[in-house]
A protein has these predicted regions:
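Structural signature for solvent-exposed beta-strand/loop edge elements and short helix-capping sites
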Residues: 1-208
Length: 208
């Protein structure tokens, strides 16, 4: 069964296995909903249940999943609280797993997810989260999800982890996508640390 919201400002649609209509309260209880397409995202309701109220207002979808970029399938968020407003408008928050080259999982919380031309999300990564790209690189700042980009983009400071106790552990400023399976950080003559000091690239060796 296909359900349509005919109001032009809403105009979403989705398929349900069955639905119940409460005409006294103007409520539709839809069941067996696999996904709802909003913009370039596919939103999966928990247990396939969706509640539609007067004026096609959809109840928030708790513990839903969001496939950001349903064509390329680059990103998926889970345990989301999602508000579907129309066929091209939603906002949400949810969780995303960063899986490194050793298949270790670190979970990021995206407090902002929405669609404008593409699905976009933002997650804060504070220093106390102790987030690592890998065993060699620690990071704090923020992550951005763009559904058209294969990898998350990171804005903040990277610390190179090493055992040299005579070298200060400063954080280098980055603004780039990072492939978690193949960490390559961009360093050039304009690269600075988090205190806006120029980063010097060098090789240090020891006989120890």
């Amino acid at each position: 069964n296909e359900l349509y919201a005919v109001a032009p400002e809403v105009n979403y649609k989705f398929t349900a296995v069955n639905a119940e209509f409460d005409f006294s309260k103007n409520i539709i209880y839809a069941h067996g909903v696999r996904y709802i397409n909003v913009g370039d995202a596919a939103i999966t309701p928990r247990h396939g249940d969706v509640v539609i109220r007067k004026n096609a207002a959809m109840d928030e979808l708790q513990k839903s999943r969001i496939l950001a970029g349903r064509e390329n399938k680059f990103h998926e968020l889970y345990n989301c609280t999602t508000h579907v407003k129309s066929a091209t408008r939603f906002y949400a928050n949810g969780y995303y797993d960063y899986i490194d080259e050793m298949d270790r999982v670190q979970t990021l919380y995206f407090d902002t997810v929405y669609f404008i031309k593409e699905t976009f999300g933002e997650a804060k990564i504070p220093l106390e989260k102790d987030f690592h790209f890998s065993d060699q690189f620690a990071f704090d700042g923020r992550a951005e999800l763009h559904s058209n980009n294969q990898f998350l983009s990171y804005f903040g400071g990277v610390e190179i982890l090493h055992g040299c106790d005579t070298v200060k552990h400063a954080r280098m400023k980055i603004l780039q996508q990072v492939d978690p399976k193949n960490i390559m950080l961009q360093v050039h003559d304009r690269t600075k640390d988090m205190d806006e000091r120029k980063v010097v690239v060098a090789i240090a060796s020891s006989n120890k």
